[in-house]
């Protein structure tokens, strides 16, 4: 029931955006002096019951809303249109400023039947989209007639009416309409008829840019092209055949583009997603292509070989060639990477070996450190179970702290030993998402600890994904299906994880974070002194922990983020160098290595220190921005400052937050270095000002932690199998 409610909320939000978009476009039409009293909106999906009130509200503004398929909706639009032109745009998509006006001006200047422009695909909202970069990467420049090579280039990838401005009287005169017998390819016959009938009267303006926006939530809100649809090949062939009946021998450019479209379709889908009985039909279509030699020139040598064999009807030969070609592409060459070869052993040998329920596979931050909740769960297991289990730690470099613990095995990330143990261990403990290829076997118990109470929006709560893979949400969903348990530190996190990860609430362990157990240790003062000694921090100095996070829109590559040190360390050294030091801790995603030699004796770099929880104990004050470290640091009830120099931009445009930072944080938001310096001079006053808010914050986010989270988690997760109560089918 809760899952359906969440999906309903997502649909509600999407419908509301569509209605707002329709209303805005009507206003834009008025501004361009287009006529028409009302707009009716037709949608391609059934509406959730909770939309009824929403639709009543918008009905007064834009007319009525009906649920029908895409082709039917477009035909209704053509029937209801009253203006001089009709124009097609999806509600998820958007235009470069002036794009529609350029098409209108061009149509009137050239007396054109149809005008269009460049199309560019993107995953981002307009606020995060680089229009200038997109304009440089489009293939049509300037104003040209839509014919010859320009027509071929424009339509070889897809026949779509998006970004077409068409004279309405021409549509009515020739009774153009969309094919309602097909769900996915209704544009094909419409486009071919239009392009044929309007030949010589069509123009394209390369500076008129249309952005086709992909949807990055394929679980809740898939676009039509992203929906699970089985095999489309039969429907595509039907649409292709209908187009052939429209095209005449003299329509060479149209035929070339259509044939190229079919070749691309076959190449992408065969053999997995083309029904066996349809494959010979594709072969026959290729054999009848009049410009076969020109079409096939666009492909590489291996692709040409496979397509040529297919064209001759030798499908039994074509299938292995196609598989080899796709395998070669996936391997990025004939040899491939080592991990890809290790996975061959995984599939054919390792996963056929018995599962070891007494082996525990442990990974923290992709093998970068012996740290976080996996560390404390492991140490509790060593303390209470000892050699009853074999512990396999994923760690790329040696760790002195790990070496001092009990018996264990260390493996490097993505090594052969990594693949072997990952295939056979009966337990997995991770604090980040697992590799997509590393799928667990039946009977494995997967404990996902996660790595912090979220401040920044996660997964399905995010709109644009600016730095991770655009399949981020789909991958996240698939990964979550493998987790048997997910740890939460508080009710707030439980609510977020259930929604953002689309995860069953019953499997969330709201037990507190094991990594915070040390913050309640009886010997925490001794640990703090030990940490200072390890880092060379002088005794008696006030330790200011500076722990900034990464920015979603500043990155080199996926998982490798840029970092600009915004805090003026030189000024802090001048103001506080006599009695204070700065302990710098950057996020594990940050790729930049900072040169701090000029601040020697004042700034201590703790970014490579394995366990951030130990750094908390050594710190008197925490300065952060949007990092979740303050949720954990607050367990110590020590002062926290928030240096958020880009607060307005970050909160509103980059990722968004789960809380109202200005009203709920347990410390002040400081936007300038002057404000930071002033705050550090008046810490007593700040602590008094934020005392009540800090207490409320602690109760909301820290009250579950008490130093025994590791015990609760281990006795639940491992105790179930030990007591014979584990549901192995979960």
Where do the language-model regions lie?
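Donor-binding/catalytic cores of nucleotide-activated saccharide
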Residues: 70, 93-231
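A donor-sugar binding/catalytic signature common to diverse glycosyltransferases
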Residues: 428-457, 609-654
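Short aromatic/hydrophobic "clamp" motif used to bind/position activated sugar donors
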Residues: 86
């Amino acid at each position: 029931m809760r899952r359906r409610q969440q999906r309903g909320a997502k649909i509600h939000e999407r419908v509301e955006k569509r209605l707002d978009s329709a209303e805005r476009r009507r206003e834009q039409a008025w501004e361009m002096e287009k006529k028409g009293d009302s707009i009716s909106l037709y949608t391609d999906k059934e509406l959730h019951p909770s939309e009824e009130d929403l639709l009543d509200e918008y009905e007064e503004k834009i007319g009525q809303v009906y649920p029908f398929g895409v082709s039917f909706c477009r035909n209704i639009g053509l029937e209801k249109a009253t203006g001089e032109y009709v124009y097609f745009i999806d509600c998820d998509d958007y235009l470069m400023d002036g794009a529609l006006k350029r098409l209108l001006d061009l149509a009137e200047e050239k007396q054109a039947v149809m005008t269009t422009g460049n199309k560019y695909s993107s995953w981002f909202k307009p606020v995060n989209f680089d229009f200038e970069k997109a304009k440089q990467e489009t293939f049509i420049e300037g104003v040209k007639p839509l014919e010859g090579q320009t027509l071929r280039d424009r339509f070889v990838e897809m026949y779509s009416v998006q970004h077409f401005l068409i004279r309405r009287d021409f549509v009515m005169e020739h009774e153009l309409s969309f094919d309602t017998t097909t769900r996915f390819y209704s544009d094909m016959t419409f486009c071919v008829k239009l392009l044929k009938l309007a030949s010589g009267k069509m123009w394209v303006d390369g500076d008129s840019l249309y952005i086709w926006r992909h949807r990055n939530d394929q679980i809740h809100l898939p676009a039509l092209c992203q929906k699970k649809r089985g095999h489309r090949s039969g429907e595509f062939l039907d649409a292709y055949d209908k187009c052939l009946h429209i095209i005449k021998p003299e329509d060479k450019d149209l035929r070339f583009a259509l044939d190229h479209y079919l070749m691309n379709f076959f190449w992408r889908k065969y053999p997995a997603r083309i029904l066996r009985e349809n494959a010979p039909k594709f072969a026959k279509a290729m054999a009848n292509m009049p410009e076969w030699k020109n079409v096939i020139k666009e492909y590489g040598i291996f692709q040409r070989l496979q397509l040529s064999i297919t064209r001759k009807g030798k499908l039994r030969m074509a299938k292995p060639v196609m598989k080899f070609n796709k395998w070669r592409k996936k391997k990025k060459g004939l040899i491939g990477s080592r991990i890809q070869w290790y996975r061959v052993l995984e599939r054919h040998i390792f996963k056929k070996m018995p599962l070891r329920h007494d082996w525990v596979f442990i990974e923290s931050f992709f093998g970068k450190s012996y740290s976080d909740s996996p560390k404390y769960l492991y140490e509790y297991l060593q303390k209470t179970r000892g050699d009853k289990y074999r512990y396999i730690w994923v760690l790329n470099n040696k760790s002195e702290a790990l070496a001092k613990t009990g018996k264990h095995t260390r493996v490097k990330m993505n090594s052969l030993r990594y693949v072997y143990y990952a295939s056979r261990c009966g337990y997995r403990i991770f604090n980040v998402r697992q590799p997509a290829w590393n799928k667990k076997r039946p009977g494995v118990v997967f404990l996902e600890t996660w790595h912090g109470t979220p401040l920044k929006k996660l997964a399905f709560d995010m709109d644009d994904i600016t730095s991770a893979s655009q399949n981020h949400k789909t991958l996240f969903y698939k990964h979550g299906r493998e987790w048997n348990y997910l740890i939460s530190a508080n009710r707030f996190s439980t609510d977020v994880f259930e929604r953002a990860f689309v995860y069953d609430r019953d499997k969330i362990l709201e037990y507190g974070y094991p990594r915070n157990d040390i913050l309640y240790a009886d010997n925490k003062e001794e640990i703090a002194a030990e940490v200072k000694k390890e880092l060379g921090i002088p005794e008696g100095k006030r330790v200011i922990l500076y722990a900034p996070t990464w920015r979603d829109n500043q990155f080199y590559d996926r998982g490798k983020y840029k970092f600009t040190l915004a805090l003026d360390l030189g000024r802090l050294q001048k103001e506080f160098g006599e009695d204070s030091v700065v302990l710098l801790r950057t996020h594990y995603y940050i790729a930049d290595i900072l040169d701090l030699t000029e601040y020697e004796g004042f700034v201590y770099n703790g970014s490579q220190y394995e366990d951030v929880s130990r750094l908390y104990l050594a710190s008197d004050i925490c300065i952060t921005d949007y990092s979740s470290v303050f949720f954990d640091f607050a367990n110590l009830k020590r002062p926290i400052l928030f240096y958020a120099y880009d607060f307005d931009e970050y909160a509103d445009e980059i990722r968004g937050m789960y809380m109202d930072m200005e009203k709920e944080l347990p410390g002040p938001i400081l936007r300038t270095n002057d404000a930071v310096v002033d705050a550090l001079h008046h810490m007593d006053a700040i602590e008094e000002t934020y005392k009540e808010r800090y207490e409320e914050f602690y109760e909301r986010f820290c009250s579950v932690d008490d130093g025994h989270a590791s015990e609760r988690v281990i006795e639940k997760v491992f105790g179930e199998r030990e007591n014979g109560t584990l549901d192995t089918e979960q």
